[in-house]
Amino acid sequence: MATITADNNSNSHFEMEIEAESAILQQIQNKMAKHLESAAYVPPTEEEQKAIDAKSVFIGNVDFNSTIEEIEEHFKGCGQIVKTTIPKDKFTKKQKNFAYIEFDDSSSIENALVMNGSLFRSRPIVVTAKRTNIPGMGHGVRGSSRGTFGRGRGAARGAPGRQQTVVVKYVYVNGPNRGGRGGRGRRFNPY
């Protein structure tokens, strides 16, 4: 840090220290920028994702307190493991009760599928081949999952662009119906 002295050179000495510190900070920022550019995540292409999924398994009913190391230890006899993932809930940040294992080659999947039903932390686990996710929540190859006319939330029923008919069962002209059990009340006036 800069020291303040009572000399006439104190301002020039102080400025030299600031320049030296700013040069050091600039070097650090340049190193970090290079590191961030090289480490930027690029999602795999569709073909690359299919190749990864062909070498991966889904593991269900995993204990919530399981660790990646424990899962890898349980599946180490199946083949060389590239990556193990336990997804977490976006909001609570707690891990979910399933995991994915990516193997080095696709022949390891058959060995892993044999582990289906085995006990892991006193729970029977479900092991299946990982499927490739189809983005779009049901829009795409699988078709729409929101009814015949592709209704989403808040969309009107019926064919798109068609006028909707609204049926009103009760009309209260002079206020609400104050009678009980279908009674007309004192103020009922249908016209």
Curated annotation (Swiss-Prot):
InterPro entries reported in the protein's UniProt record: Nucleotide-bd_a/b_plait_sf, RBD_domain_sf, RRM_dom
Alphabetically ordered keywords of this record: RNA-binding
Molecular function via GO: poly(A) binding
Protein origin, superkingdom: Eukaryota
SMART domains: RRM
Start and end residues of each stretch annotated as Disordered: 136-160
GO cellular component: nucleus
Span of domain RRM: 55-132
RNA-binding keyword on record: yes
Protein name: Putative RNA-binding protein EEED8.4
Gene source species: Caenorhabditis elegans
